[in-house]
């Protein structure tokens, strides 16, 4: 058998992982704290990789900012990864978008955005969000603790938007949004994890793979 090779497929052909029944406390807490995402402009989130490790080919920055990417017929996906970090528990939630296009002639193929939800420890009862750190271009914005108006119960609310001519980013919002099926890093197939570790995404960077994840927690640490 030859070396593993990346395989890109049409952005609308990537099927998401169904959300598994959570078994461990960590998995149950990750599902409980799934954030809401409100898309103000641009693409809606799409699956980035399938069970075989085939990856989303994305879209050129042509047409309208939301052209050809208003939602996958197969359903969307939010990815997750968690870890203990500096005495607290971090859960990263990650979305993939086929293009990041604030307007014609601006932007790039592929976009990854994410938010890190910080809690004291993974417990099913009386879990409390200590902070949220959404990705904001090359860094993070931080709310310690989150504004109550930016929460819907245990779901932190975020908006995906662009302030022209700058590319899209996340910020907390009062607006309600949608949740997607969650698949955690350890729940994915080995082919999918390998693809997310190896495949290049141009100007966008996968924030939760083995080579990047802990560094992102370090950069976003809000305390």
From Swiss-Prot:
Sequence motif Conserved undecapeptide motif, location on chain: 90-100
Induction section of the entry: Expressed strongly at the early stages of host infection (up to 24 hours after infection) but subsided quickly afterward.
Stated name of the protein: NLP effector protein 3
Functional description taken from the UniProt entry: Probable secreted effector that may act as a pathogen-associated molecular pattern (PAMP) recognized by the plant immune system. Seems not to induce necrosis, neither in several susceptible or resistant Vitis species nor in the dicot model plant Nicotiana benthamiana.
Species of origin: Plasmopara viticola
Pfam family, any one: NPP1
Motif (Conserved heptapeptide motif): 107-113
Sequence similarity: Belongs to the Necrosis inducing protein (NPP1) family.
One GO cellular component, as annotated: extracellular region
Gene responsible for this protein: NLP3
Localization per record: Secreted; Host cytoplasm
């Amino acid at each position: 058998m030859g070396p593993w090779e990346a395989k890109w497929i049409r952005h609308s052909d990537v099927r998401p992982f169904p959300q598994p029944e959570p078994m461990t406390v960590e998995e149950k807490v990750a599902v409980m704290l799934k954030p809401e995402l409100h898309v103000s402009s641009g693409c809606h989130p799409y699956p980035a990789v399938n069970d075989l490790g085939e990856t989303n080919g994305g879209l050129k920055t042509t047409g309208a900012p939301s052209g050809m990417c208003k939602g996958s017929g197969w359903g969307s996906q939010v990815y997750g990864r968690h870890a203990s970090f500096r005495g607290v528990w971090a859960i990263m939630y990650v979305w993939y978008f086929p293009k990041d296009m604030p307007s014609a002639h601006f932007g790039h193929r592929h976009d990854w955005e994410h938010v890190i939800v910080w809690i004291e420890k993974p417990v099913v009862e009386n879990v409390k969000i200590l902070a949220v750190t959404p990705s904001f271009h090359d860094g993070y914005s931080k709310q310690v603790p989150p504004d109550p108006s930016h929460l819907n119960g245990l779901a932190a609310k975020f908006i995906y938007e662009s302030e022209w001519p700058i590319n899209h980013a996340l910020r907390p919002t009062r607006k309600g949004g949608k949740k997607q099926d969650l698949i955690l890093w350890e729940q994915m197939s080995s082919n999918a994890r390998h693809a997310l570790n190896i495949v290049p995404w141009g100007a966008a960077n996968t924030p939760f793979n083995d080579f990047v994840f802990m560094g992102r927690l370090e950069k976003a640490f809000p305390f």
